[in-house]
Amino acid sequence: NASGSAVRKTIGTDERSPVHLALPQNQPTFPLLALIVSGGHSQLVLFQNHGDYQLIGQTQDDAVGEAFDKVAKIIGLPYPGGPAIAKAAELGDPRAFHLPIAKLAGEYDFSFSGLKTAVLRTVQREVGKDFTFPSHELPALVNDELRHNMAVSFQYTAVKTLVDKTKKAYDNFQPASVVIAGGVAANQELRRQLREALPIDIEYAPIQLCTDNAAMIAALGYFRAQID
């Protein structure tokens, strides 16, 4: 059927396909720019219509959610890293560390592996030990002040990486709407920076769909069925 084939098109085996996208429950306005951010995906997708989309940017290494998980492990925070880092960041000094944003050839592409390495090197320097990652010894040496300061610095930089590329895509393509989907869409720092960067109201996939891929796929199939 039409909805089934549409879902297959969207969630196909091609790893570049926007698996984590759930279009908003109300009628979306096209053209639509989607930022898909999760443990498995960091993608910018431009939709001209349902099923008519173009991948314009993606991570060249770690997905942003994966970077959150790895950094959480480095500084001794639990899994999943996203919520743990967001909570620790509330207690940190955002000026404590200046972390790098990767410069890439792809205009809308992301990279987080250099940021993760910068966190590791900074923590090694701060504790005076060069334990490698992953290591149980390193997080044990991280005190609360370092943990909180690194959490807020990493979160700010990772989010700014996403927001800068999303703003560049928005400015160039002038979409009618912007949608954020995936587990990292729940991050409040991401929402704050996007509000400041974009002159448009941003729509978010429902939180329950942000973290449950099966529910997202079902929602997408249902939505397609309504319009076919």
Residues of each region from the PLM?
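Acidic, glycine-enriched active-site microenvironments
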Residues: 1-12, 18-228
